[in-house]
A protein has these predicted regions:
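Long, contiguous internal "core" modules enriched in hydrophobic/ aromatic residues
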Residues: 1-231
Length: 231
């Protein structure tokens, strides 16, 4: 039953549809079960490739956040000056504490800082036990200036001068890269749990302000919610 459920989503686009748009049991002409298996295998290989690529993005974001937040103080990530007024920093720190408790004595660095420094963890130590979703949420909470600084190191530069007043307001409220990190968090978790990527919708990520960046011209217009944009 489990295997049938996993394959059923790959079957659906290949099944016949009657004149009243009802899906029938048989395949469309020219398609058979071998095509379903081929789609499944292609998706499995895509998951492997994306999971490998996501590691580089995760490590890159962690290191950039460390450089920004710990420039003057190893515990700088706890300072509100880096964040938007509406960001729930206390809530985020509670989540981080749960990640530390989860790692416990199994993480040598965490154990060392707990015993020697009373549980005051530099961000470069803390970040190693955070989920990518935690790191992504921290980026979303940063001021626009801080977000833009990190985005530029990823090659994402938004020319505010070329935007209208309303567009600038939209971008400052939520940097486009924040929505991409949110989408990539879901993509990453889908890969980690061997879920389906093909023909699936994810949290939409805005493309309006990044399609002018060299290499990103082929992104869908407006927003991207399929795996093509994430790749």
């Amino acid at each position: 039953a489990g295997l049938y459920y996993r394959l059923s989503a790959y079957c659906y686009p290949l099944r016949r549809v009657d004149t009243e748009e009802h899906v029938e049991d048989g395949f469309v002409p020219g398609a058979d079960f071998a095509d379903v298996v081929a789609l499944y295998e292609a998706d499995r290989k895509l998951r492997t490739l994306i999971h490998d690529g996501m590691e580089r993005i995760e490590v890159g974001l962690r290191s950039r956040l460390t450089s920004l937040l710990c420039r003057d103080n190893a515990l700088g990530y706890q300072e509100r000056r880096f964040y938007r007024s509406g960001f729930d920093l206390d809530g985020w720190l509670r989540t981080a504490r749960r990640r530390v408790d989860r790692a416990g004595a199994h993480n040598t660095a965490i154990d060392h800082y707990k015993k020697q420094y009373g549980g005051q963890y530099p961000f470069w130590v803390l970040s190693e036990v955070l989920d990518f979703g935690d790191v992504s949420k921290l980026y979303q909470g940063l001021t626009y200036k801080a977000q833009a600084q990190i985005a530029e190191t990823f090659g994402i530069t938004i020319d505010l001068g070329a935007l209208s007043k309303n567009e600038r307001k939209i971008v400052r409220r939520r940097h486009p890269l924040a929505s991409w990190f949110e989408q990539l968090t879901i993509v990453r978790n889908t890969c980690a749990h061997h879920g389906r990527l093909w023909n699936k919708s994810f949290v939409p990520a805005s493309t309006k302000y990044v399609r002018t960046i060299p290499g990103l011209e082929s992104l869908p217009d407006g927003q991207s919610e399929r795996i093509y944009g994430a790749v």
